[in-house]
Amino acid sequence: MKDNYILAFETSCDETSVAILKNGSELLCNIIASQINSHKRFGGVVPEIASRHHVEQITVCIEAALEEAEISADQLTAVAVTEGPGLNGALLVGIMAAKTFAWANHLPLIPVNHMAGHLMAASLVDTIEYPAMALLVSGGHSELVYVEKEGSYKKVGETRDDAAGEAYDKVGRVMGLTYPSGKVIDELAHKGQDTYNFPRAMMNTHEVEFSFSGLKSAFINLVHNENQKGNDVIANDLENLAASFQAAVVDVLMAKTKLAMEKYPVKTLIIGGGVSANQGLRERLSAEITDEKLIIPPLRLCGDNAGMIAAAAYIEWKKGLENVQAGLDLNAKPSLVFEDM
């Protein structure tokens, strides 16, 4: 049988990435050009800057991917690209590049949901036994997705307000940390203790939903109130603050994940998204998820990358191109959700 090679593009936010996947499991290359340093001074991603960086880097990434994989365009089976969700301008850069490459080389074009990519990154690590549950946590999303069988996605829970990663970044700003602050908060948390009684929203409800806005507000209010008393709690107790905040986030994520798995019994639990790099969350999952297979991708596959997009595209390709192939009128879908697939 002829080998399957998928060239994938990911430009949904602030990483320009191009990857080539062989036969759905062998990642030949996963080129990532990060823009973090360009966004740090703004405390978050600036869409216009992100788009300009994608334009500058996309061709370089394509050339690097083909060179590293030692693959020529005529060996490729298909081109895949993130169509959403994400920043509109950023998505369009990747989509235009993918459409141009596909058209020029007479290749089919497969659109991919960015969150399906985060989910299917697990398939690059281990075999997913179905049915499966996925906890997807990032700067823009916190959701639980039930995967009854390969390529079937049902969102069963999500955040009502802030995503977990968004809460980390906002709290990090209050702490005086540079963007992105999740890794630093995680490191500080491991040096401190859970000494502050921060709220765990919706812990006692039977709804598979998250809420982190109350936690964020409680953190900000505590810091403000302590400052009013003359206690610079950020300077005096930063590690315990970080530990208490992270404990609250992880408690909620764990509780709702377990609730989802009670409602939808599964064989595998997958974790994906940028926040899945959090060591505190990884430790809790490894300690408490013992009856189901647990797949946690390595750090290189947690953030945005085209390798995961290729993995999700391979699943779509197996459904038959007549069912999944996009035309050259493919457009960005910044608010794409699983229900739209």
From Swiss-Prot:
Q: How is the cofactor bound?
A: Binds 1 Fe(2+) ion per subunit.
From the Swiss-Prot or TrEMBL record, give the protein name: tRNA N6-adenosine threonylcarbamoyltransferase
Question: What Gene Ontology terms for biological process does this UniProt record contain?
Answer: tRNA threonylcarbamoyladenosine modification
Per the record, the major location class is cytoplasm
Enzyme class per UniProt: transferase
Taken from the record, one Pfam family name reads TsaD
Instruction: Kindly indicate whether the keyword Iron belongs to this entry.
Output: yes
Question: Its biological function?
Answer: Required for the formation of a threonylcarbamoyl group on adenosine at position 37 (t(6)A37) in tRNAs that read codons beginning with adenine. Is involved in the transfer of the threonylcarbamoyl moiety of threonylcarbamoyl-AMP (TC-AMP) to the N6 group of A37, together with TsaE and TsaB. TsaD likely plays a direct catalytic role in this reaction.
Task: Give me the gene this protein comes from.
Answer: tsaD
- InterPro entries tied to this protein: ATPase_NBD (IPR043129), Gcp-like_dom (IPR000905), KAE1/TsaD (IPR017861), TsaD (IPR022450)
Organism per entry: Lactococcus lactis subsp. cremoris (strain SK11)
